[in-house]
Amino acid sequence: MISKPDKNKLRQKRHRRVRGKLSGTADRPRLNIFRSNTGIYAQVIDDVAGVTLASASTLDKEVSKGTKTEQAIVVGKLVAERAVAKGISEVVFDRGGYLYHGRVKALADSARENGLKF
């Protein structure tokens, strides 16, 4: 009998494949997304120095209410504001192997509206 594929392993495989071609620099850091069942996390990362420059997640106090998609919109707004405050305006978007749809798209659109270019 054919077993069902593990969705998370397939996502990790996609993410590894994309990360081979994609990296963040000090001039244009990487906006990384991680999506769990209960929350969404976003980090702006300089891969050359190995440093997180800005981050936001549903664990922040400002993001406690609403649906998961509404929370993703607030997380996108927060991470964009924190990155712009540190002088970062352009990033490389790393969707983490997730489809560009739903919460990931909502976060990306919100980050774009609040000053990040990608």
UniProtKB/Swiss-Prot annotation:
Q: Name one GO molecular function term.
A: structural constituent of ribosome
Annotated Gene Ontology cellular component terms = cytosolic large ribosomal subunit
Q: Which InterPro entries match?
A: Ribosomal_uL18_bac-type, Ribosomal_uL18_bac/euk
Compositional bias (Basic residues) at which positions? 10-20
A Pfam family hit: Ribosomal_L18p
Q: Name one GO biological process term.
A: translation
What the entry lists under CDD domains is as follows:
Ribosomal_L18_L5e (cd00432)
Q: Which domain of life is it from?
A: Bacteria
Give the SUPFAM superfamilies listed for this entry. Translational machinery components
Q: Where is this region: Disordered?
A: 1-22
Alphabetized, the UniProt keywords read: Ribonucleoprotein, Ribosomal protein, RNA-binding, rRNA-binding
Q: Which HAMAP family match?
A: Ribosomal_uL18_B
Q: Which family does it belong to?
A: Belongs to the universal ribosomal protein uL18 family.
Function comment:
This is one of the proteins that bind and probably mediate the attachment of the 5S RNA into the large ribosomal subunit, where it forms part of the central protuberance.
| Quaternary structure, from the entry | Part of the 50S ribosomal subunit; part of the 5S rRNA/L5/L18/L25 subcomplex. Contacts the 5S and 23S rRNAs.
Q: What is this protein called?
A: Large ribosomal subunit protein uL18
